[in-house]
Amino acid sequence: MIITKQSKKISELKKGDFVTVNGKKLEIDAHYVFEDYKTTKEMLVELFDSKTDKDYQLRYFSDQLEDTLKFYELKEIVYEEAEIDKIEW
């Protein structure tokens, strides 16, 4: 995975901002704490593609972004992990 551009810290991303994953421009619907551990937080960024009406998620731990950033695509009722080649925001 290559983070090609960061217009701001990932923690500052909010509803209405855009993230481009593998060349696909996705809009942020929500960004929140999924699980709060005492030393770190597992974060979720809910994304959608308005052209295809598909839903996606970015998941990461607040203290280990580079090592833990994962991308998921909603298939039926379950999110499945998908490969990230390039990402920017």
In which residue ranges do the predicted regions lie?
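Mixed-charge, low-complexity intrinsically disordered regions
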Residues: 1-89
